[in-house]
Structures are given as C-alpha cells and as structure tokens.
C-alpha cells in the first residue's frame, strides 16, 4: 500500500483527486499544505524541491520510499487501487477516457468562465459566453451517458468519477445556478451522489451547489493584482513623510492579506467545529460492551480485497454475534418502481440521508429485474440486536418503506444471503428476478 506526502496549497482541486483516491484505496497520505511543512511560492522554488520536481508545480507526491511523482492525474492513478483504475482492460481504458475528457473538454471552458468570478483572470465577455456554450455541450454529453448509469464506468465509483467531479467542482460551486443546470438532471444527480460519499466528504466537506451565478467583480480582480511601487513624485513630501507612508502602505497590504486569508480559516474552523460537535449527540450504542468485530477493518477488506476469497471469510471469522445483528430488507412497493436508474436513486438517496449511521452499519442493497419490472432488497449489518432506525431520530429515514426481518446468523439461509448479496452473484432463489445492479452502504 502506498505511503507518502502530497505537497499542495489549500483547496487545490487538482490535489483533491489524489486525496479522494487515497480515501478509497487506504493509501497512507500526509498532506503538506501549510508552513512549516510547505509554503507555496517558497518551498516549491527551493533547490531541494526542484531536484525532485523540476517544474516546481503542485500537487507533487513523494513516497516514504523516495519515489516522486508530479502531475495530478499520475499521482491520483498511483494512489488508487485496481477497483478505481478499472479491473478489466476495457474498464481501465474507459477510466482513462474520462480522465482525458476532463482535462481536454471540461477544464478549459470551466477555467475561462469561473476564474474571472474568483478575481484571478480578467473578464472577457466573448470568451465567457463561448465558455458557457462549451460547458453546456460537455454537460449534455455527460447527461446522456448517465441517463442509464449511476457512475461513469461500471457500478462503483472509479477514478473517472473522482476526476470529473473535481473538474466540475468549481462550476457547481460558483456558476451552475439551478436554471442553468436544470436541463442536465442526470449530471447533477450523479455529482451529488459522488460528493455525498464518505470518501469524497472526508476531502471536500459539505459541497453546496450554487444558488446564483457568480459574476466578474472588477474590484476583487484589482485587489488580486500585484501591487505596484509608489510613484517617485511622492518623495516631494519629504524624507519623513516617505518613511511614514511606507510602513502604512505595508500595514495596509498586510491587513488585506490577512483579510483574504481569514475567511478560509474561519470557514475551516466552523466546519471542524460542526463535525466535532456531531459525535457529542447521545450514542444509542453507548451502553453496549466493546465489540471484537471492527467494522471499519471489514469495510477496508471489502473495498480493497476480493469479496469471496478475502472479505467474506474475514467477516465470518471476526463477526461478533452478540454485538451485531444481520437483517434482510425488502422494498414494500415494487409496483411503483419504473426506470432502473430512478430505482437506484431511491437506494442512494436513502444511503445519503443515513450518513450518520455509517460507522455502525454496513449494507448491500440490490435492484433486481428491468425497467417497469423490478424489486429492491438487501442485507444490513447493524450494531446491537435491535433494528437500528428506531434508536435515533437521525436514523429514522426511509426505513418504513421496507419490511425488515432479523436473520439467524447460524442458519444456512443467512450464510447464503450474506454471500450472494455481498458478492452480487448467486441464484437469489427468493427473488425470482435477475441481478440488475447493487449499492453498498459503508
């Protein structure tokens, strides 16, 4: 498993790709984005840094073994696992296709449109209007592709999704207001599905979509430009005047720099404070003795290893029958299910709203059948012996749309169901329909 340091500046969307990939693969990644570990504009110009990364660009990766990489896509690829890169030659090629698509089709128009709104590029009306049209074309391509798909390649998040999401991030945050994104519902549905995955959230935090399209701010642009030296004619004020004016100007510049930095620091503090305050809510499982079954370790095995030969044996070898329970759930209203992608949205929507339950649960939920003839059922593993949803108001979401049956962990029925639902393969005799696609809550 890879282990190393990623050098970057804060909020670098190119670095986000590598960070999210590491969240999925389990790669041990240290982030150097602040002094003394890394100061952008200084550290990356030092001889020591340039000897490993000749261009002086970030993100840049240095492994604990001394292995060095620059270019964000290469770093993200290196930190991924086989599931993210594409487990077959075809899937791997498709992942590369979408990574290239992001670089060549999304980034140029996104930069031309978004950068002026951030004050880091001069506004050009013709260039901006052209960029908007190119973004529409890109979104139309994605919308068509995602019409019958949950993710860009295969049935799980891949490096394709990570890369394209990060490339669209500032568009969604700055300029894609509701009216503009309305014709592309599949793209927005997919984008929200991705950014609400715990691995994305760990890096991006809570992503808020743009409510009103940001516009070019001439004042902000002027503030972002390098300060010019005071004209020589001001020396007429005398030596003392010059001496007084210079420190004042420096103070003003320092204050402006502090003001620019302050919002990011305050926002981070608020975010961290909010996250820190969440666990203080009453834990429904606080009364239970510590379990020998480490849910997070099983989830890592499931994500990174073969299900049948590694993850499943690990599950049964370590499963705590007293501290955990296994439940079978079946959607109550199969007659209301229509298009497959809409049925999948029911599942992912429930998962997203149950985010606070993740550390105490695991589930594999499957859509069976085809359009207008389908059903949904799944296997859930909960902490404790009771159905989790009734234990906390935060968890009472969508569960009443399902019937729930606690399984006997020693029964052959339970062992067969766990195997089939976790592996997404088998006869599924109790269903009577073929496997369509599955979703994992972890």
Curated annotation (Swiss-Prot):
Stretches for region Disordered: 224-273
Protein name according to UniProt: Elongation factor 1-gamma
Record GO terms (molecular function): translation elongation factor activity
Keyword rRNA processing part of the UniProt annotation: no
Domain EF-1-gamma C-terminal: 281-442
A single GO cellular-component term on record: nucleus
Signal peptide extent: none
Boundaries of every GST C-terminal domain copy: 88-216
The protein's role, per its UniProt record: Probably plays a role in anchoring the complex to other cellular components.
The organism of origin for this protein: Carassius auratus (Goldfish)
Transmembrane segments: none
Keyword list, A-Z: Elongation factor, Protein biosynthesis
InterPro entries (UniProt xref): EF-GSTs, EF1B_G_C, EF1B_G_C_sf, Glutathione-S-Trfase_C-like, Glutathione-S-Trfase_C_sf, Glutathione_S-Trfase, Glutathione_S-Trfase_N, GST_C
Compositionally biased region (Basic and acidic residues): 224-242, 249-263
Record-annotated GST N-terminal domain positions: 2-87
